[in-house]
From Swiss-Prot:
Record's protein name: Small ribosomal subunit protein uS13
Gene3D superfamilies tied to this protein: 1.10.8.50, 30s ribosomal protein s13, domain 2 (4.10.910.10)
Gene: rpsM
GO molecular function: rRNA binding; structural constituent of ribosome; tRNA binding
Purpose of the protein: Located at the top of the head of the 30S subunit, it contacts several helices of the 16S rRNA. In the 70S ribosome it contacts the 23S rRNA (bridge B1a) and protein L5 of the 50S subunit (bridge B1b), connecting the 2 subunits; these bridges are implicated in subunit movement. Contacts the tRNAs in the A and P-sites.
UniProt superkingdom: Bacteria
Family (UniProt): Belongs to the universal ribosomal protein uS13 family.
PANTHER family the UniProt entry points to: 30S RIBOSOMAL PROTEIN S13/40S RIBOSOMAL PROTEIN S18, SMALL RIBOSOMAL SUBUNIT PROTEIN US13M
Biological classification of the source: Bacteria, Pseudomonadati, Bacteroidota, Bacteroidia, Bacteroidales
Oligomeric form and interacting partners: Part of the 30S ribosomal subunit. Forms a loose heterodimer with protein S19. Forms two bridges to the 50S subunit in the 70S ribosome.
Length: 126
């Protein structure tokens, strides 16, 4: 039986602890806490979960954590707020440069994007 939690299909043959990390906003540590609270062994494969266990995990996640679309939209709103108030981090977001003090003279290609080459100036002959 395919297990679907918050719009994400969990892989059937993975351990519960690993499979829950396929949900945006849940990492290894949080998945362990969720399974402990639900009373499910971390090493149990998803295909071996019962309907009651799936419902318990679903309920714990929806009650206690902000994940998937809600988390993505909250992050986007936080970035938009930074840009609107015009703080340093907001300005760096706006112009697409690193936010946390990294040097941009040589590297920062991930944030800056592909190189934009500038043609050399032609020398004037005397």
């Amino acid at each position: 039986m395919a297990v679907r939690i918050l719009g994400v299909d969990l892989p059937q043959n993975k351990r519960g602890e690993i499979a829950l990390t396929y949900i945006y906003g849940i990492g290894c540590g949080l998945s362990s806490k969720i399974l402990t609270e639900a009373g499910i062994d971390r090493d149990t494969r998803i295909k071996d979960w019962t309907d009651v266990q799936v419902a318990a995990v679903r309920e714990i996640i929806s009650r206690n954590f902000k994940v998937e679309g809600d988390l993505r939209s909250e992050i986007q709103l936080n970035i938009k707020r930074l840009m609107d108030i015009g703080c340093y981090r907001g300005i760096r977001h706006r112009i697409g440069l690193p936010l946390r003090g990294q040097s941009t003279k040589n590297n920062a290609r991930t944030r800056k994007g592909k190189r934009k080459t500038v043609a050399n100036k032609k020398r004037v002959t005397k």
